[in-house]
Amino acid sequence: MPLTWKDSGLRWYWVVVLVFLADQLSKQWVLANFDLFESVQLLPFFNFTYVRNYGAAFSFLSEAGGWQRWLFTIVAVGFSSLLTVWLRKQSASLLKLNLAYTLVIGGALGNLVDRLMHGFVVDFIDFYWGKSHYPAFNIADSAIFIGAVLIIWDSFFNSQSEQDKTEEVK
């Protein structure tokens, strides 16, 4: 018998909504309060700096001429759809994987909306040391990164033992 939404990982979809809203609200705040490249120092190693990212992580393909917008749109929709199908098929009790998948989906959808609305992703979190700046990023990027780390962690350390525990409960 297929899992109901309450019993499946779809029960965790509230994380997608939370990440998406936090990401979009923070980006709207930046767009309303900052000029492009404007920077406000918050700590001696941390700024809010409004930049536009036409590429992917670390501005990968940002100078590609525009076609990458549609490639990244297809990738975001594809991965979000795939992870949603996986959430539907797995137990709600797989905490780490469900959290990981929903973080990635929320982040992917947050950046997808930027690409579709603006043609670029709004980045503003700027960490630096001296004159060396880490590439600016946003809440969606952070969620995707944390989700990816959790997926990798789970694949090396926990997936089989958590699956065994879930099957024992049934």
UniProtKB/Swiss-Prot annotation:
Which regions span the lipid bilayer? 12-32, 67-87, 93-113, 137-157
Q: How does it sit in the membrane?
A: Multi-pass membrane protein
Cellular compartments annotated: Cell inner membrane
InterPro entries given in the database record: Peptidase_A8 (IPR001872)
Q: Name one GO molecular function term.
A: aspartic-type endopeptidase activity
Broad class of the protein's primary localization: membrane
The signal peptide stretch is none
Biological pathway: Protein modification; lipoprotein biosynthesis (signal peptide cleavage)
Query: What's in the GO CC field?
Result: plasma membrane
- EC number(s) in its UniProt entry? 3.4.23.36
Q: Give me the reactions it catalyses.
A: Release of signal peptides from bacterial membrane prolipoproteins. Hydrolyzes -Xaa-Yaa-Zaa-|-(S,diacylglyceryl)Cys-, in which Xaa is hydrophobic (preferably Leu), and Yaa (Ala or Ser) and Zaa (Gly or Ala) have small, neutral side chains
Q: What residues make up the catalytic site?
A: D123, D141
Please give a single GO biological process term from the UniProt record. Answer: proteolysis
Which superkingdom is the protein from?
A: Bacteria
The record's section on Pfam families has: Peptidase_A8
Kindly state which keywords UniProt assigns to this record, in alphabetical order.
Answer: Aspartyl protease, Cell inner membrane, Cell membrane, Hydrolase, Membrane, Protease, Transmembrane, Transmembrane helix
Q: Which family does it belong to?
A: Belongs to the peptidase A8 family.
Q: Which HAMAP family match?
A: LspA (MF_00161)
* Purpose of the protein: This protein specifically catalyzes the removal of signal peptides from prolipoproteins.
Descriptive protein name = Lipoprotein signal peptidase
The top of its lineage is:
Bacteria, Pseudomonadati, Pseudomonadota, Gammaproteobacteria, Alteromonadales
